[in-house]
Amino acid sequence: MPHGRVVNTPVTIAIDAMSGDRGAAVVVHAALEAVRENEALSLVLVGIRSELEALLHEGHARIRIVEAADVVRMNERPSHALRHKKNSSMAIALSLVRDGEAQGCVSAGNTGALMAFGRSIIRMYPGIERPAIAKLIPSLRGRCHVLDLGANVDSTAENLYQYALMGSLMASAICRQSEPRVALLNVGEEEIKGNEQVRLASHMLAQCDTINYIGYVEGSDLFRDVADVVVCDGFVGNIALKTGEGVAGLLIELLEQAFTRSMYGRFVGLLARPIIGRLLQLMDPSRHNGASLLGLQGVVIKSHGNANERAMLAAIRQAVREVQLEVPRRINERLDDLML
């Protein structure tokens, strides 16, 4: 699948360094690797200065630290964070994007709080009711954008329609697809299947001449290159994503066991190492970490809360790519023409 051409212009990304499950060390190590591999990249680590400076040791010319007095906890209600955590690492990282000191933000923190702060600080596209979490997942012959993955557990037909618009525009921006195939995730392919909101959204998309809507797909189609954009509500999407990640992890573990259990298995594994290596790389969820908060007028990437160094590095790369491809501007330019 062709991808959007990235111009290697200077980029600054703000990172919420304190909110992930694994602490700041993972973020700092990923940040150091990110600036090593990309000379055009500068990073702003937002968090407790003393802790970050200790982890950075001698520092780096393209990594600076911005002090944050507070941290949003994973179990904190978004409404509480919005009222009481305005000086948190998450809120300050987003404020740097709003103020033009950074072009994008990465956080492994509380998803609901990130959405709430994003809507409050960076603002939404005009006409978009709710943001959506979108992610590129590997498929049989390419990759597929799936959204929403947990921002909104209840979505109306209008919400689903708007997710489809944003997903289609994102696929065009990132993968340079002129007519990405857009589908709704459902319990069957027949028109009568699904709840009322899904059926109504299907009718709305079928009436939209500028969207290449192909109808319903089932969960088993997500990885089969049937569609380029798959739309669902956040409840369904999050379960589908976590199930896929769980199956991938299981397959990786089973393969490792099969090729280490016996002398014969080790011999076969040695012969198959190049093929197995590529397969494991494709299935490894940490290599595909980083979901986009679509609907916000800026690049905001949600990392998995339990991300390791490799996964955090993938999220930083995703933020850089979206900034360099000007994804928010490209979506915003065309949304007005597509809105009902």
From Swiss-Prot:
Q: What does the record give as its pathway?
A: Lipid metabolism; phospholipid metabolism
GO process terms (BP)? fatty acid biosynthetic process; phospholipid biosynthetic process
Q: Which domain of life is it from?
A: Bacteria
Its annotated compartments are: Cytoplasm
GO cellular component annotations of the record: cytoplasm
Tell me a Gene Ontology molecular-function term this record carries.
phosphate:acyl-[acyl carrier protein] acyltransferase activity
* Family per record: Belongs to the PlsX family.
Q: Which NCBIfam families match?
A: plsX
Q: What is this protein called?
A: Phosphate acyltransferase
Organism of origin is: Marinobacter nauticus (strain ATCC 700491 / DSM 11845 / VT8) (Marinobacter aquaeolei)
